[in-house]
Amino acid sequence: MSFDVPAEAYDRFMGVHSRQLAPQLLDLARLSSGDRVLDVGCGPGALTAELVDRLGAGSVAAVDPSESFVAAARARHPGIDVRLGAAEALPYDDGVFDASLAQLVVHLMADPAAGLREMVRVTRRGGVVAACVWDHAGGRTPLGSFWHAVNELGLGARDESHLAGAREGHLVELFKACGLRDIEDTQLVARVEYSSFDEWWEPFGFGVGPAGALFQTLDADQRARVRARCLEFLPPAPFEFVSFAWAARGVV
């Protein structure tokens, strides 16, 4: 999969949905004024922006393995500490944050268990770890129609339903396994309006994430067939895309 893409590509592909989830994840985390918070896998900064609005730039740090996303997050939020790094090896000392959050990231970690253990490590005792992942197993995501079409047409690709946290209860299992306590889980909902089918379809060509990576392997005929099936699955434009994410909160 690839996230070595311009920030604007991610914004159009997934950022429009991420911005809907960010305030809900922060509500679940129940942060307090003065908390020092880390955004793990920050991307171009959808969750980061919400954190800055609520807590101020001086209370927020962010990290991402994509150089282009780190550059974008730094440009958009010049007052915060944004570092290049992977979730599995966070470039911070033990217990330096009051909370560590990961929005739409756990399922994309190379080693989700290790990434969550690192989030626990850098969070103080009594602090909070929270995360959310699309309900890929239920197909209720911005990508559901695409994966449905790909699977129906037998294009030989594995969708994202098997990934960490992408089914009900799995984030809770992962949180328990890394020692978190007082765990809560819930669903988050994102509602995004599209004025045309192509507004939803075209960003797949940007090569973002597993779906975008697969799209780039398809030839012109295969892309046309997937597009035709997606047109049948989705309502006439304009339409609202309603997506669901599983979310969990635990205490260190």
Task: Go through the PLM ranges and name each one.
Residues 26, 49-52, 116-120, 147:
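A structural alpha-helix within SAM-dependent methyltransferase catalytic domains
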Residues 113-114, 120-195, 211, 244:
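Conserved catalytic/acceptor-binding region of the Class I
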Residues 3, 17, 44-46, 163-252:
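Conserved Class I S-adenosyl-L-methionine
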Residues 1-35, 46-54, 67-72, 76, ...:
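Conserved class I S-adenosyl-L-methionine
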Residues 99-112, 135:
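A short SAM/SAH-binding and catalytic strip from SAM-dependent methyltransferases
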Residues 36-90, 114:
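Class I SAM-dependent methyltransferase SAM/SAH-binding core
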Residues 88-100:
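A short acidic, Gly/Pro-enriched loop at the edge of an enzyme's catalytic core
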